[in-house]
Design a protein with these regions (language model features):
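Sec-dependent N-terminal signal peptides
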Residues: 4-13
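C-terminal motif of bacterial Sec signal peptides marking the signal peptidase cleavage site
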Residues: 14-18
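N-terminal helix-cap/turn-to-beta initiation motif at the start of protein domains
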Residues: 19-33
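Contiguous, well-ordered beta-strand patches that form the walls/edges
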Residues: 38-43, 49, 59-124
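An amphipathic, hydrophobic-aromatic interaction surface with interspersed Lys/Arg
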Residues: 52
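Short, low-complexity, Pro/Ser/Thr/Gly-rich segments in the mature regions of secreted, periplasmic
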Residues: 130-141
């Protein structure tokens, strides 16, 4: 009986010491669909979810940019930093070949050449980013 107790205790301790990296992004973590892209002044619409199918996926320190209407089905991955109300894209890679690309290559996804976004709104359901390229509104799905 004592050996069963020790075995159960060892199993419990092993289960509690998993090696998974913990998420540090809070509400930012997840899949985001672009619903509206407006100019920086807000006077005209550049794209909506009806004209473009742009998605951002956030996990750990990776940001994935994807346009589902792009027939080539390529996407880009980038490392990013999230601090308070700022999101900064640092290094970007083109998939499927993992080529390093300049940040201005991400302009079609709404990413500015300097990679810096201001987070205007962030909840578990909505995200609003602004930059010199415009204001991007997303919904979580």
């Amino acid at each position: 009986m004592k050996s069963i107790y020790i075995l159960l205790l060892l199993i419990a301790v092993t289960c509690m010491t998993a090696c998974n990296k913990m998420d540090e992004n809070g509400a930012l973590d997840g899949n985001w669909q672009l619903t509206e892209w407006r100019t920086a002044t807000g006077d005209s619409i550049i794209a909506t979810n009806h004209t473009r199918k742009i998605y951002y996926t956030v996990k750990y320190d990776i940001l994935k940019f994807q346009d589902m209407l792009d027939a080539s089905n390529y996407h880009c991955l980038a490392y990013f930093r999230h601090q308070a109300d700022t999101l900064v894209v640092e290094r970007a890679f083109s998939q499927p070949f993992d080529d390093v690309i300049p940040l201005d290559s991400l302009a079609n996804y709404g990413c500015p050449a300097n990679g810096r976004y201001l987070i205007r709104r962030l909840t578990h359901e909505h995200l609003v980013l602004s930059s010199d390229l415009g204001v991007l509104t997303f919904r979580k799905f």
